[in-house]
Amino acid sequence: MAIEREEQDLNEQFHASKEYGADQIQILEGLEAVRKRPGMYIGSTSVRGLHHLVYEIVDNSVDEALAGFCDNITVTIHKDNSITVEDDGRGIPVDLQKKAGKSALEVVFTVLHAGGKFGGSGYKVSGGLHGVGASVVNALSSFLDVTVCKDGKVYTMSFSKGKVTKEIECIGTCTEEEHGTKVHFLPDAEIFEESIYDFDTLKVRLRETAFLTKNLRIKLVDEREEELREMTFHYEGGIKEFVRYLNKGKEALYPDVIYCEGEKEHILVEVAMQHNDSYTENIYTFVNNINTPEGGTHLTGFKNALTKTFNDYARQNKLLKDSEPNLSGEDIREGLTCIISVKIEDPQFEGQTKQKLGTSEAQIAVQGIVSEQLTYFLEQNPAVARVMCEKSIMAQRARAAARKARDLTRRKSALDGVGLPGKLADCSSKDAERCEIFIVEGDSALGPAKEGRNPETQAVLPLRGKVLNVQKARLDRIYANEEIKGMITAFGTGINEDFDLSKLRYHKIIIMTDADVDGAHIATLMLTFIYNFMPELIKEGHVYLAQPPLFNITKNKKHYYAYSDEEYQNILKEIGAEGADVSRFKGLGEMDTEELAETTMDPETRTLLRVNMEEDDKAELDITFTTLMGDQVEPRREFIEKNARYVKNLDV
């Protein structure tokens, strides 16, 4: 639903100088201590850091695309889990870098903070999370080979653990039309805890990058299986297609995506948005293709523009009565999926991790462009404006009802136990770091759980009624649900804008359900609630899933507990099946107090799974929760059929 106006290529202003030689490479500091402290440069040496190496090299290629010189990027996972990233950009410069007295290619791969993005003429805008790129990948790789096609010649150079192993060499010629860079590297097993790349993790990030870089084609190839696996991401519609993708499984309230684009304050702004029938807002913000999960000035500008523009239109067109209050930003954003993407020459971020944009001009630019173009859109599309207004008014009424219920909850003090749910068996300690709460499904397990707990540090909250599916409910229904009210009050943090992590009463929230399909469904309902209204609990590592055993094997008066069919078979092999008495637990209620305490509750002997969430995963998580908990049956069926092969024990 783009706004019609004269065609103009706004990207032209942001394309860099065509001069891209050694003099455009600036050196800010030497490559030091990367191998000693890799976490400082790539976040961690876990599987997350492993994948970050790929992103660093890909981001360099994307910078070429943003500058207008690259159309294709191919990422290949080889059989040995080495990676090749190839682009058709200008090719990294190979001539002499005067200050360093060595080739620019060597400088890029051996000097930290060396690259065309720091001088201003090589790149107008660039991404890359830490701006360290190629040199850090080189330092953390057991080998790295780079091939450059440039000016009719092919050059190669090789490295190992940051050191040159083969000097730059011209190995042949290419046509003038052939150009680009190919980087092949193998992460160093001495550095990384994991060495195996996950296709789906790379797929999610590369798809996002393709959405954000209109017309860039990114191909992901996996050579590790007998049958080659390939996926290509190419989106002519850019972020408009991103919004449609994120709205999969939801009912859009109007057919086309609203799109605003323009340039102001030397900042290129793109915004795409569409309302759906859900009750949560999903807004994702990016600066030079970098995800800014904490928002910042570009998000503030958008929210200001949306709220003021919509209220002004609603007043002028009598969609709101004079006696009615203005719609709040939250009301207007209910069910909104939105992508905000800005391109800035020298973005200022708050904090080291670039999670929040601080550039003040971005607020002015986004606010101005969205205000002007959204006003025009609403005037041209009164039917869509009416649909948006009706949804916002419904949200306003629901929020008012929810506020009354919330105020009742707020008046009760969690500190002295007043107002805590009557069914909560609380612990005596007030030290939140030592305390944990078990959310227990059903009455049958409640007795053993209460008796088997440590009453000093372990609380038990039973779920007796049905947990509301919050994916399909407004705030007023959420506050009216007894089970959810009980959890909100017991946890102590509040939800949404009231959330305060410092008031958390238990540092471990443990969801304890039966190990069957019904138990998994109840656990998913609870996780859906926490994810939507208290996501910080997951981000900060406070949410866990208990792992009750499936089997109790007794032989020679000794008990063995198996938590999976595979473990059950291994135990039988080890102790011998003859004379072994096997019982399968169908639910928590079938265990006696001692069994439940030993296998599922005692910190010394239990197994817990911590629920993790990375900010990079949020868009995919939103889609997964919508698929599993939304109204549409067909996407859910497709998801289960597609993922059933990854499930070892499918209880149907």
Show where each model-derived region lies.
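Short adenine-binding "F-helix/F-box" segment of the Bergerat
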Residues: 97-98, 105
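GHKL-family ATPase ATP-binding module
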Residues: 1-24, 31, 53-55, 63-65, ...
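C-terminal interaction appendages of subunits in large macromolecular complexes
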Residues: 397-416, 431-437, 447, 451-453, ...
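A short glycine-centered beta->alpha linker in the GHKL/HATPase_c
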Residues: 91-96
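Conserved short strand/loop->alpha-helix "switch" segment adjacent to the catalytic nucleotide/phosphoryl-transfer site
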Residues: 36-55
